């Protein structure tokens, strides 16, 4: 996803943050 490193740490949380 857009996060990159952050996505690796929290996939589900990153999605919520992006949207």
From Swiss-Prot:
Tissue specificity: Expressed by the venom gland.
PTM field: Glycosylated.
Species this chain originates from: Trimeresurus purpureomaculatus
Functional summary from the UniProt entry: Thrombin-like snake venom serine protease. Releases only fibrinopeptides A after 2 hours incubation. Clots fibrinogen with different clotting time depending on the species: cat > human > dog > goat >> rabbit.
GO biological process: one example: proteolysis
GO molecular function list: serine-type peptidase activity; toxin activity
Keywords: Blood coagulation cascade activating toxin, Disulfide bond, Glycoprotein, Hemostasis impairing toxin, Hydrolase, Protease, Secreted, Serine protease, Toxin
Keyword Disulfide bond: yes
Subcellular location: Secreted
Enzyme class: hydrolase
Main location, first listed in the record: secreted
Annotated family: Belongs to the peptidase S1 family. Snake venom subfamily.
Protein name as annotated: Thrombin-like enzyme purpurase
Domain Peptidase S1 residues, every copy: 1-19
Record EC number: 3.4.21.-
Entry superkingdom: Eukaryota
Record carries keyword Glycoprotein: yes
Subunit note: Monomer.
GO cellular component: extracellular region
């Amino acid at each position: 996803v857009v996060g990159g490193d952050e996505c690796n740490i929290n996939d589900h949380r990153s999605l919520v943050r992006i949207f």
